[in-house]
Curated annotation (Swiss-Prot):
Recorded family membership: Belongs to the class I-like SAM-binding methyltransferase superfamily. Cx-SAM synthase family.
Full protein name: Carboxy-S-adenosyl-L-methionine synthase
Species assigned in the record: Haemophilus influenzae (strain ATCC 51907 / DSM 11121 / KW20 / Rd)
CDD domains tied to this protein: AdoMet_MTases (cd02440)
Keywords: S-adenosyl-L-methionine, Transferase
Classification via NCBIfam families: carboxy-S-adenosyl-L-methionine synthase CmoA, PRK15451.1
Gene: cmoA
Amino acid sequence: MVKDTLFSTPIAKLGDFIFDENVAEVFPDMIQRSVPGYSNIITAIGMLAERFVTADSNVYDLGCSRGAATLSARRNINQPNVKIIGIDNSQPMVERCRQHIAAYHSEIPVEILCNDIRHVEIKNASMVILNFTLQFLPPEDRIALLTKIYEGLNPNGVLVLSEKFRFEDTKINHLLIDLHHQFKRANGYSELEVSQKRTALENVMRTDSIETHKVRLKNVGFSQVELWFQCFNFGSMIAVK
């Protein structure tokens, strides 16, 4: 695993965070050391796939990055005639994802596409995964995507939505942000790295509250919506059609 040192030295002109070649190269290390509970979420996606994925259906991993969630789901699917479609708009991520998937043998076919998830059709889905992806979409585009997912899911299909959250209570919000930064420092990131990455993400990652997510998912039509995992200001929800 290549170590993430992208923000370890001062950057004079710090632009917006993008999922380019450099990020794709270090992404597994970056997300492991940056997102509390990431491994637990990836493991549980497999457990949820085992329960929810049905025969003759599709599984979508929207914003699949290097394929961790796709592989976890595939390892746990025991139904026939299932296809997994992974989509990411970063060509470097897609290339590494294809290599990663190809390294593991399975009878379940996986197709990895380089595309904008807003432009991809969702159909005959028993499971859709949005693992730390929705937060990077413009807020005005989120309902349309979730509506498309809901309409493309079969009855009793599941959406797994993992996100960084913000909290309405200012003190709690600041506390959880501070704890997250402490988590990153404990994982070897310096103050400079934490600060520069935070600045780079400011304009591209816009977080919602847990309540905002719940209300939006119910308004779209999901019958059951619940937070199943949280660590500091990161977590994951399930929404069942």
